[in-house]
């Protein structure tokens, strides 16, 4: 490796303090975005955005009590329980996503943790989607060591398991799964040799200090997640957070920018809540270092901007869809 190559390698820190993160959030908005965009340009093409598609392969009746989630069996939200989709239907959806330009296909199942029989069905889905030439991601709750190894054997590229919020605010959002449970599953995914997709949700009534704490939890993992989805709360009638005050859009953009600074080599993804974002807000997020989106009409059980709207926005901003492997 040459000295120039060493100089261009990202400096990945895992020792961020609360004070440092809060100081970044407190920067003047223009200064924060300038720093984030400068770091972004060192490691990524600033006009390229990776596109993923997400399909709910098993919907509703989840035993967890996540306060934001319309799929929880604890709340009356109108989401109907649906069994695990067939392999044929999943592959048909993956093919459509591929034709629309998605390079990664993510499959979400509303479980606390998958049963072994269901895991075998998911493994077959992973193998089928891989055969289409797409990257694969699964989110299905907590995993055992053996389950993580089985998904790796099937060819799974990414496993999603979010921290959701800061460790200090976590108990306000969920009581049926501990913060440590989440860390344990992330370690099992790493030990099995898969990439990690891990982020959180903002706008759940947390403080700015909690948003800083969420990013510290992510950046101080033994390895930074390769993908960091930043979700804006989708307020769903029937959930405990349905009446939560809307987050200031600039606070969301700040969260994206600080995520970019603290995790310079990770893909920062705009995830749930984009249907509530203006084009101008999304443009600021891209300027702040977001370089991945979920693409398509729906995100699990919530609305997502239609593909045509995304194409128009990309054209207006001069953005390109990234190729496979980005």
UniProtKB/Swiss-Prot annotation:
Xref: Gene3D superfamilies: Aldolase class I
The entry marks the following residues as binding [2Fe-2S] cluster, namely 106, 137, 197, 269
- Pathways involved: Cofactor biosynthesis; biotin biosynthesis; biotin from 7,8-diaminononanoate: step 2/2
Q: Where does [4Fe-4S] cluster bind?
A: 62, 66, 69
| Pfam families for this protein | BATS, Radical_SAM
UniProt KW keywords: 2Fe-2S, 4Fe-4S, Biotin biosynthesis, Iron, Iron-sulfur, Metal-binding, S-adenosyl-L-methionine, Transferase
* An MF annotation (GO) of this entry: biotin synthase activity
Name the needed cofactors: [4Fe-4S] cluster; [2Fe-2S] cluster
Give the reaction(s) catalysed: (4R,5S)-dethiobiotin + (sulfur carrier)-SH + 2 reduced [2Fe-2S]-[ferredoxin] + 2 S-adenosyl-L-methionine = (sulfur carrier)-H + biotin + 2 5'-deoxyadenosine + 2 L-methionine + 2 oxidized [2Fe-2S]-[ferredoxin]
User: How does the cofactor attach, per the note?
Assistant: Binds 1 [4Fe-4S] cluster. The cluster is coordinated with 3 cysteines and an exchangeable S-adenosyl-L-methionine.
Domain Radical SAM core, which positions?
47-274
> Could you state one GO biological process linked to this protein?
biotin biosynthetic process
Q: Which E.C. number(s) belong to this protein?
A: 2.8.1.6
Matching entries from InterPro entries are given as: Aldolase_TIM (IPR013785), BATS_dom (IPR010722), Biotin_synth/BioAB (IPR002684), Biotin_synthase (IPR024177), Elp3/MiaA/NifB-like_rSAM (IPR006638), rSAM (IPR007197)
- What SUPFAM superfamilies does this protein map onto? Radical SAM enzymes (SSF102114)
Provide the function of this protein: Catalyzes the conversion of dethiobiotin (DTB) to biotin by the insertion of a sulfur atom into dethiobiotin via a radical-based mechanism.
The similarity comment for this entry is: Belongs to the radical SAM superfamily. Biotin synthase family.
Q: How does it assemble?
A: Homodimer.
PANTHER family tied to this protein: BIOTIN SYNTHASE (PTHR22976), BIOTIN SYNTHASE, MITOCHONDRIAL (PTHR22976:SF2)
Q: What is this protein called?
A: Biotin synthase
Native source species: Methylococcus capsulatus (strain ATCC 33009 / NCIMB 11132 / Bath)
């Amino acid at each position: 490796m040459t000295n120039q190559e060493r100089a261009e390698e990202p400096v990945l820190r895992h020792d961020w303090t609360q004070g440092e993160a809060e100081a970044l959030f407190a920067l003047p908005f223009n200064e924060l975005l300038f720093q984030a965009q400068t770091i972004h340009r060192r490691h990524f093409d600033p006009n390229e955005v990776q596109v993923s598609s997400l399909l709910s392969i098993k919907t509703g009746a989840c035993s967890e009590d996540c306060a934001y989630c319309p799929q929880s069996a604890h709340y009356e939200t109108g989401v109907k329980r649906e069994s695990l989709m067939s392999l044929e239907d999943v592959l048909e959806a993956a093919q459509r996503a591929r034709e629309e330009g998605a390079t990664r296909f993510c499959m979400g199942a509303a479980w606390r943790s998958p049963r072994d029989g269901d895991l075998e069905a998911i493994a077959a889905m992973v193998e089928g989607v891989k055969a289409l030439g797409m990257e694969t991601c699964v989110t299905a709750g907590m995993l055992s060591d053996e389950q993580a190894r089985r998904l790796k054997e099937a060819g799974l590229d990414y496993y999603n398991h979010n921290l959701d919020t800061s460790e200090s605010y976590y108990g306000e959002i969920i009581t049926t799964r501990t913060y440590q449970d989440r860390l344990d599953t992330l370690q099992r995914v790493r030990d099995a040799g898969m990439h990690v997709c891990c982020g959180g949700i903002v706008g759940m009534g947390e403080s700015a200090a909690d948003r800083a704490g969420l990013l510290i939890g992510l950046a101080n993992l033994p390895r930074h997640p390769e993908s960091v989805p930043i979700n804006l709360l989708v307020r769903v009638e029937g959930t405990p957070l349905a009446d939560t005050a809307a987050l200031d859009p600039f606070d969301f953009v700040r969260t994206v920018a600080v995520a970019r600074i603290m995790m310079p080599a990770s893909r920062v993804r705009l995830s749930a809540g984009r249907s509530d974002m203006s084009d101008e807000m999304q443009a600021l997020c891209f300027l702040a270092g977001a370089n991945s989106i979920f693409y398509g009409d729906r995100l699990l059980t919530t609305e997502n901007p239609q593909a045509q709207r995304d194409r128009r926005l990309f054209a207006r901003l001069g953005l390109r869809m990234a190729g496979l492997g980005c």
